[in-house]
Amino acid sequence: METIAVRHGLSPTGLAVRFVAGFLPLAGLVFTTPHVCAKTWHVAPEAIQSIATTEQFETIGEGVARARPGDEVTIHGGIYREKVIVDQNGLPDKPIRIRAAEGEYVVITGADHITDWSETQRDAHVYVTGWPHEFVGWNDHNTHPADDYHRLIGRCEQVFVNGYTLGQVLERDRLIRGTFYVDLETERLYVWPADNQDIASKKALVEASVRDRVLHVKGDHIEIKGIRFRYASNRAQQGAAEFTGDHITVTDCTFEYTNASGAEFSGQNIVVRNCVFQHNGQLGFGASRAHGLRLTGCTVRNNNIKGFNRGWEAGGNKICLTRGAVLEQSTFVENRGDGIWFDIGNEDCEVHNCLIAFNENAGIFYEISYGLHAHDNVIVGNGFAHTPSAWGASSGISLSSSPFCVIERNLIVGNKEGFNLREQRRTTPRIDGPSEPVWNHDQIIRHNVMAYNRDTQVWGWFDVADERHWPASMQDKPPAAPASNDSAAHPTHLSLEGLKLTFANNLYWPGPGQGLFNWGVTWKKHRRFKSLEAVRDELSLGEGGEVAEFHMVDYSALDLRVPPDSPAVRMGCYPTGDIPGVRLGSAR
């Protein structure tokens, strides 16, 4: 009785009321609310004999559709070629759980297994099949973005032979081994395997991406665990898995080999725990208005494998218009762009106890946003790609027109540049309001180690005509700028004293031939300071800082233990807490 009531949307309380109303002569009896037991639904490619047929399904979508608050959908091992939509809600104390069965390998893929091939060129083993799919239909080149740079990169099609990715060409006569071509006019897909094998014999597994999303969680209070997501044909700036509901928990999942972004988070209070974002075409993940996002114990590595423009949107992640995001105890490594990128109107975000290493652009790039707290991180080996537009953003940490930040107890070692302030004339939308001017001010950079960074340990890249980054006494008054519609909104008469930039108690150690403290962009007035005394005398920055030898046990092995008498320890510049993949502490 109670199970039927719940399945038909009738609450246990409603059932009791109807029962009492129908039997008023029995008013002396006491009626209690029926107990509704949570159910477990099973999903498996083939029937499991030990489970009732009424409790198992062939597709995840069928199982999810039956789930109610407190239920669990257990997915057994298999490759599931479907798009799963979760649009019902759990409850705070009764979330809906969707998880891989213990010890089983579960994949949700955007690719179908293609078997209907015809050979078109016997000596070269070029094959053709039907292709009714079009993913970007709003411009002539079927790409996003629609510029020439992304003419090929911005396409969405993907083909895999035995798990190996084929390259794409834009003309049929350019086919070579290991490539494919999509003819949208004739709706044909042409494939030439890298090993020239006969794929029509069905001895090879040929998969092609046909779904632009593999998962969309719209509901609140949903838990996802232990699933691998891959091979979606999503366009740039679109997640292969999308999480738009609130209070979602994603644990032990992998997002990989998608055409663009592995996942997109836009609900509030989402927790992402022990997940891997790897080998995605554009980004590991994106987030927008994902207030309270917490990413903990995750690995974000080798993303932007298609080569999207690093200065547009590419690399480990991009987070926009989000308040209170926390990235902790995670690794952001070897991404082809920034390791961590916050851009546009973010507020009060935190990055702590992370390894941020060997990313092609900045380790952390905090752009036109507010109030970053970055502390107790190891940030090494970032910024060495040739990205001409990345001036002021080829460093361990770059604050780009982003005020009210606190940067403390980070090891910023061995990057192209150590710490950057990047300034242009910028505005940003606010989370709860219209756009406004934004610039670097009220910054606290304290108790960090900045050592062995190739070009310099600190560089203030201020590309502004008003010379705000110089003390008033050092400014060369520029001619008045022409009036513009937004002139009144932007700050005027600024000087370094008014910016309230604090560099305090940092430890600096340039290696041989490396810079210490640069100020100003190279194409305008700038200085290269060779001593902290000169920095203090001219800029009044660097209070309590020291230039002193900094040594580690083995930088290449990320054994960053230091001697007990290290100045990093004495000055309080050494990270506290554990950081994944790094050995920290005192070495005797």
Describe the function of each predicted region.
Residues T40-G245, F503, Q514-G515, K524-E549, ...:
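Extracellular polysaccharide-degrading/modifying enzymes targeting complex plant/algal/animal polysaccharides
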Residues P34-C37:
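Sec/Tat signal peptide C-region and signal peptidase I cleavage site
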Residues R18-T32:
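Bacterial N-terminal signal peptides
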Residues M1-A16:
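N-terminal secretory signal peptides that target proteins for export/translocation
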Residues I248-T249:
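Mature catalytic domains of secreted/periplasmic carbohydrate-active enzymes
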Residues R211-L215, R230-G245, A260-I270, Q278-G545, ...:
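Glycine- and acidic/polar-rich repeat regions and solenoidal domains
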